[in-house]
């Protein structure tokens, strides 16, 4: 950390510690913080890191604001073990070995797939909706993909430009409400 802490980002900022990130988030209790744990070399390392993350969140009384996400099934299981009340999202970009929605439901975590996976395997969304596993599509940065997500009943989308996507969805809702008197789009 000593080396990273000396790096100055554009705007004169530095990379915050996890504690600093959580303390900033604590200032707005209505904000959900999504913490992504990257995959590590061994499950043992992931377990230790998850334990430290959950311990710090508990110490700062932040668990109620947290959602956890990872590309590692093991890390997701550890988050569920140590913070079972928190939403845990398994992320995948594998077209050929996506985690089974039934397994995710049994494990208690939700699923997030890349646009590439969902667009090539839309039946995954159908199965997730059928058994009550939330679906998240990433990364959605253009209106055409938003339209596709709405058409295919994706539950959530993740974007590098959430303000633009929200504005687009708001415009769709306005048009749909004017047309039908109600609208039930992506939450």
Each PLM stretch: what is its role?
Residues 1-87, 91, 95, 107-109, ...:
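Metal-dependent phosphodiesterase/phospholipase catalytic core, i.e.
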């Amino acid at each position: 950390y000593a080396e990273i802490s000396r790096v100055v980002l554009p705007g004169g900022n530095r990379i915050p510690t996890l504690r600093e990130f959580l303390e900033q988030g604590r200032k707005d209790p209505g904000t959900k913080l999504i913490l992504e744990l990257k995959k590590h070399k061994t499950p043992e390392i992931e377990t230790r890191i998850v334990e430290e993350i959950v311990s710090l969140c508990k110490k700062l009384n932040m668990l109620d604001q947290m959602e956890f996400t990872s590309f590692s099934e093991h890390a997701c299981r550890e988050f569920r073990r140590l913070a079972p009340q928190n939403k845990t999202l398994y992320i995948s970009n594998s077209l050929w070995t996506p985690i089974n929605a039934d397994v995710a439901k049994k494990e208690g975590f939700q699923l997030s797939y890349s646009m590439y996976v969902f667009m090539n395997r839309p039946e995954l969304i159908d199965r997730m909706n059928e058994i009550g596993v939330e679906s998240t599509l990433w990364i959605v940065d253009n209106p055409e993909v938003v339209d596709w997500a709405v058409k295919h009943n994706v539950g959530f989308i993740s974007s590098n430009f959430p303000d633009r996507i929200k504005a687009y969805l708001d415009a769709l809702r306005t048009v749909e409400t004017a047309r039908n008197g109600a609208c039930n789009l992506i939450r």
